[in-house]
Amino acid sequence: MSSVPAPREYFLDSIRAWLMLLGIPFHISLIYSTHSWHVNSAAPSWWLTLFNDFIHAFRMQVFFVISGYFSYMLFLRYPLKHWWKVRVERVGIPMLTAIPLLTLPQFILLQYVKEKTENWPTLSAYEKYNTLAWELISHLWFLLVLVILTTVSIGIFTWFQKRQETSKPRPAAISLAKLSLIFFLLGVAYAAIRRIIFIVYPAILSDGMFNFIVMQTLFYVPFFILGALAFIHPDLKARFTTPSRGCTLGAAVAFIAYLLNQRYGSGDAWMYETESVITMVMGLWMVNVVFSLGHRLLNFQSARVTYFVNASLFIYLVHHPLTLFFGAYITPHISSNLIGFLCGLIFVMGIALILYEIHLRIPLLKFLFSGKPPVKQESRAAIG
């Protein structure tokens, strides 16, 4: 445990907040994309599909790197039990709050919008359970994964800490090229695991809880650990905050490969396995792209930025049902995809900000949506 706080990483706070807020244009553009979602526009837009695919290809990989970075930073600052308790509360309480207040009403709304209310009694017990697992966890899945990663990382972080205490500080002798190879192999390993599961017991891949708890956690754990290593080794972090032409070009090529796989791949063949390899290495390269841009443009203290950093989790939690409401009841009345997309941004962001300001004035809601007890002020701690 260290009593000396690490310097404030303003650019990482900002990047994490903007990555979370990117969920708003991501889901609104999903309405107007060629991808089948809960609600879709009458005619899809190719450029909004492209925009949607780009966000989806890297956003959460970078997010989990930052989460791992802050998690290890706080691991060194607090006793183990206190660290685990605070970390789980910060993500677990908002997740459990959002299920009855947000995703359950969202599920009921979709049942009526998609005219599935009459079919519900005909479903088997497992089908009802699995439907509820997908629909109630919904966009909260990353909070569940963070709870799991926090618990799993206890042993890993303890080992890291012991190595730091017993070994002399030394540079992380690994280049971005070596990291790229490692993440490529990790992508292949993940793809192999998925293919084996697909061959042995394909039905389990459609199980919501298995997908969230096992498959998502397996995919994102390398990025979470990479974030912790970036905190341990400043030279490794410097590799990410220093612009790399190779990473930029690699990310561009990987995104083209991602689009081609989306266009020509088949779910019954190797599309998902190929995607896991592509997004694993693209996620690594985009860490460099995003970190280097953020370090140059966002590494400063600003009251406005701090406001959105603090508001980002709440806004993300409430934006999803607002987006679905917009898609179901307002999108059909707007013929232009561009105007509809812009109106969606204004509608969702505007209402989300109003709700955020209201919840700040109600201590119980403020606690439930932040996981922070009202008697404690730990504004320096990170949420994920």
Curated annotation (Swiss-Prot):
Biological process terms in GO annotation: glucan biosynthetic process
Name recorded for this polypeptide: Glucans biosynthesis protein C
Keyword Membrane: yes
Top EC class of this enzyme: transferase
Listed HAMAP family: MdoC_OpgC
A Pfam family annotated for this UniProt entry: Acyl_transf_3
Record pathway: Glycan metabolism; osmoregulated periplasmic glucan (OPG) biosynthesis
Enzyme Commission code: 2.1.-.-
Superkingdom, natural source: Bacteria
Organism encoding this protein: Salmonella typhi
Membrane topology: Multi-pass membrane protein
NCBIfam families xref list: PRK03854.1
Function (record text): Necessary for the succinyl substitution of periplasmic glucans. Could catalyze the transfer of succinyl residues from the cytoplasmic side of the membrane to the nascent glucan backbones on the periplasmic side of the membrane.
GO molecular function: acyltransferase activity, transferring groups other than amino-acyl groups; transferase activity, transferring one-carbon groups
Transmembrane regions listed in the UniProt entry: 17-37, 54-74, 91-111, 140-160, 173-193, 212-232, 240-260, 274-294, 311-331, 338-358
Compartment(s): Cell membrane
Family label: Belongs to the acyltransferase 3 family. OpgC subfamily.
Keywords for this protein: Acyltransferase, Cell membrane, Membrane, Transferase, Transmembrane, Transmembrane helix
